[in-house]
Regions:
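Short, strongly hydrophobic transmembrane alpha-helices
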Residues: 1-17
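Arginine/glycine-rich "motif VI" loop of SF2 helicases in the C-terminal RecA-like domain
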Residues: 4, 27-28, 142
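Generic signal for short, ordered secondary-structure residues
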Residues: 5, 74-75, 158
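Amphipathic, positively biased hydrophobic alpha-helical segments used for protein targeting
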Residues: 11, 15, 26-28, 117, ...
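Hydrophobic, regular-secondary-structure patches
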Residues: 15-87, 94-97, 111-112, 129
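Hydrophobic secondary-structure segments that place a key small or acidic residue at a functional site
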Residues: 69, 81-178
Length: 178
């Protein structure tokens, strides 16, 4: 009986330790975030304001929210060069913190950028290096008929410089309201 009780205690202890270890690992990877995709199908629709309302109604569950609107149909252009594989997202001032992005240069998007529909953006490292020789802050990038002033450059996310086109380092983030 004593051996059986000890075995159960050891098994429960190992299980609890493994659970904590897995939670810590997931938290370090940023998996304490939730992504909700809203598609234009069906009779129900949602807006960015709905997302903010849900966060206000559930402050104990949601610490921060940010919309991520896919604008990738707008192919970025710098001079005569088109960046066909770049992703373009409309986000708010919380997005960089939620994704654990750090800045290499400049600043993140700010509340006033969103409120005032400013034509500014933050770019990934790949675009900064290939389009601007590492000096993108203050330059402009064209999306459709609009020009956006680059206010920040993200630190590299991908360690292999040969594998950067079409990934996190090849993104452009602009105010979702623009």
């Amino acid at each position: 009986i004593i051996i059986g009780v000890m075995a159960v205690i050891v098994i429960v202890g190992l299980g609890n330790g493994m659970t904590k270890s897995m939670r810590d690992s997931f938290s370090a990877m940023g998996t304490n975030t939730l992504s909700i995709s809203i598609w234009g199908y069906g009779s129900r629709s949602a807006s960015v304001e709905d997302v903010y309302d849900i966060a206000k109604e559930n402050p104990d569950l949601l610490k921060a929210v940010s919309p991520q609107i896919d604008f990738s149909s707008n192919t970025p252009k710098v001079g005569t060069t088109t960046y066909r594989y770049s992703y373009v997202y409309g986000v708010d001032e919380n997005y960089s913190a939620l994704k654990n992005y750090t800045l290499a240069k400049g600043r993140s998007l700010q509340y006033m950028d969103i409120k005032d529909n400013k034509q500014v953006c933050v770019i990934g490292d790949f675009i900064n290096r290939t389009a601007f020789g590492g000096n993108g802050v203050g330059q402009t990038i064209k999306l459709g008929a609009y020009k956006f002033r680059i206010v920040g450059v993200l630190s590299p996310k991908i360690s292999d410089p040969t594998m950067q086109e079409g990934n996190d380092d090849d993104c452009i983030y602009l105010p979702y309201s623009t």
